[in-house]
Amino acid sequence: MGRKSMDIFSSERSLIGRLFQKSILGLFLAFLALVSPFMGAAKADRIKDLGYFQGMRTNQLTGYGIVTGLAGTGDSSLQYTIAAMTALSARFGLSMPSNVSPTLQDAAAVIITADLPPFAKPGQTIDITVSALGRARSIRGGALMITPLYGADGQIYAMAQGNLEVGGLGISGRDGSNLTVNIPTAGRIPSGATVERAVDPGFASAPYLQFNLSEADLTNVQRVATAINNALGPGRAHVLDGVSVAITAPEGAEIRTALMGEIENLPVDRADARARVTINARTGTIVINGAVRISPAAITHGRLTVRVDENYGVSQPNAFGQGQTAVTPNSTITAEQTRSPMFHLQNGANLTDIVKAVNAIGATPGDLAAILEGLKQAGAMNADLIIL
């Protein structure tokens, strides 16, 4: 009876898993089939959609601080937390004997990170992310003490402080049981830092303006230079390499800012992207762009299913014997391989053909990834295969 129930449960679970995988893959393939007719077509974009001007960049800030007000979920013995709280107490005139090492269960050492956007001015606020550094179980409900945020040059660019917003939850019982939802040791503080120092973008006094593509492309960089010359006059823009375009402009922040605003809104025809297939092995996500083409190839893909059934029996000795009652496990391992029909891809098969062929054999995302890897190894797919 136990074996039959377990077989039924295993069959239902495997059936649900197959239906879930097929439904997810079906949605993915339907999406690809819907957008594939439009992916290869050239579209007029703005220059600002292809890259950015030199100096208009985000800078990362980092700081180390203390979160207080935790309900016994903080760091109990981390020396950094103790030293920081001792220094904070001394700042407010509270001295602590040197031989005293307090236990701070309501405080936690944290790392604060933030992105300083371009042209941020003193007095503006930015969002920050707070993450536990030590043994804190949760920082939910805590408040970050005032903390300086440093740039890569070691200068202070912002000051952070505020109450945390934590989406995770962690609860522990006295018997050792615990319940954790999401990540309770990381949170955010919207507008939690005030900018104290501005970053000079440096474009006002540079010998020329420089526009950089977000991704190197020889065709796109030439088209950007051509669009700028057509709008501003011949010889104003010169290609430096596969990423950068140099633009001559009069000196001065006001005139260059106006010129940059005009340039970034110029239309340009984006070149077709390189054929690329991206596979995220952890999530099963597969992205195929419309430039992928397939050479003649025949494909078949089998599926191997391994099943382990666990049953337990009881070994009961005689009443007058010296043996002991014991539980004896009984494992049954079976392997089943299913065969899929072979399908043939014609020369120059595009994304739609791949979607139809893979959908016809009912492949899962894992099967599709294996098929694409096989096509690449066989030299039948002219695309960059990127596995994350």
From Swiss-Prot:
User: Which source organism does the UniProt entry give?
Assistant: Zymomonas mobilis subsp. mobilis (strain ATCC 31821 / ZM4 / CP4)
Could you list the residue ranges that cross the membrane?
none
Instruction: Offer a single GO CC term for the protein.
Output: outer membrane-bounded periplasmic space
According to UniProt, the name of this protein is Flagellar P-ring protein
- HAMAP family the record matches: FlgI
User: How does this chain assemble?
Assistant: The basal body constitutes a major portion of the flagellar organelle and consists of four rings (L,P,S, and M) mounted on a central rod.
What does this protein's UniProt record list under function? Assembles around the rod to form the L-ring and probably protects the motor/basal body from shearing forces during rotation.
GO annotation (BP), single: bacterial-type flagellum-dependent cell motility
Provide the alphabetized UniProt keywords.
Bacterial flagellum, Periplasm, Signal
Entry-linked InterPro entries: Flag_FlgI
Q: Which residues form the signal peptide?
A: 1-44
Signal listed as a keyword: yes
Pfam families the UniProt entry points to: FlgI (PF02119)
- A single GO molecular function term of this UniProt record: structural molecule activity
